[in-house]
């Protein structure tokens, strides 16, 4: 089973109390949600939200205090205006919000093209309505693709990789992860990053972020925190790369300046060596938390 990252730290900063209404905006496999429910008492409510249509069919929690929405967490302010949201929840704002921005080991193994470790259809989409990565490669110009790889992957060979991909597309459209890896590998120099990471790592990250509008989703939910959380409500966000962490840090800082929130984490919280040994995925996790004023 997918191990929830920074579980103790999430509970510490989210601080769910009996009777509260908490939102897990990235339900995933439900690891954080199960622990949150333990703290809510008989009258608390937990709303799970996930864009991945498979999450709730596989990991739905059988508990009258739990309800779920198959939706994008960026739409939470709209979801909460719907009287059905949260089922028995009588308020349209929550006392806590958790966002774990990583993708799970189950998604990596889902056959949807998130991983470059095996050859599978190049989809990279969390649901069936999002345009798949293979179509994105066809639609973007070389210049546009280079911008995606540079800005979302922070890849220094962005131009060479974009050119190699578009050159390959002229011969035969790239349909699988294996074909994309081959194009990338041809573009980067031998000894790429001195072997520290796979040559495809940053390009795959960039395409996944672009296909699913991950940074735009994060910015949208941050803009609407006051519509989502009650005064005193807590938001806990776990990010896994510098682009996400920078957005969270800057929004928290800007909201603090105008007296909208109190930052609870002066520096991002990271995993202990013990947790990293058990769950290597936690190595790059950074947790930031704040309280709405």
What are these regions (language model features)?
Residues 1-293:
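S-adenosyl-L-methionine-dependent methyltransferase catalytic core, i.e., the SAM/SAH-binding region
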């Amino acid at each position: 089973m997918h191990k929830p990252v920074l579980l103790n730290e999430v509970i510490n900063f989210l601080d769910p109390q009996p009777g509260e209404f908490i939102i897990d905006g990235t339900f995933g496999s439900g690891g954080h949600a199960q622990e949150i429910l333990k703290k809510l008492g008989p009258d608390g409510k937990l709303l799970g939200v996930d864009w991945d249509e498979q999450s709730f069919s596989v990991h739905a929690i059988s508990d009258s205090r739990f309800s779920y929405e198959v939706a994008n967490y960026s739409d939470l302010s709209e979801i909460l205006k719907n009287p059905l949201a949260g089922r028995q929840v009588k308020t349209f704002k929550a006392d806590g919000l958790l966002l774990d921005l990583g993708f799970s080991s189950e998604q990596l193994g889902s056959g949807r093209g998130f991983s470059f470790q095996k050859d599978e259809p190049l989809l990279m989409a969390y649901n069936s309505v999002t345009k798949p990565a293979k179509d994105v490669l066809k639609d973007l110009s070389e210049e546009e693709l280079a911008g995606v790889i540079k800005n979302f992957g922070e890849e220094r060979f962005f131009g060479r990789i974009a050119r190699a991909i578009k050159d390959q597309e002229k011969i035969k459209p790239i349909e699988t992860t294996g074909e994309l890896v081959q194009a990338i590998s041809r573009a980067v120099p031998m000894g790429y990053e001195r072997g520290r990471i796979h040559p495809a790592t940053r390009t795959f990250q960039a395409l996944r972020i672009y296909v699913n509008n991950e940074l735009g989703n994060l910015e949208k939910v941050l803009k609407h925190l006051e519509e989502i959380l009650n005064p005193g409500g807590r938001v806990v966000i776990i990010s896994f790369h510098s682009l996400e962490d920078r957005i969270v840090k800057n929004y928290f800082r800007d909201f603090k300046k105008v007296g909208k929130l109190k930052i609870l984490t002066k520096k991002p919280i990271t995993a202990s060596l013990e947790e990293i040994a058990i769950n290597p995925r936690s190595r790059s996790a950074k947790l930031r938390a704040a309280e709405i004023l």
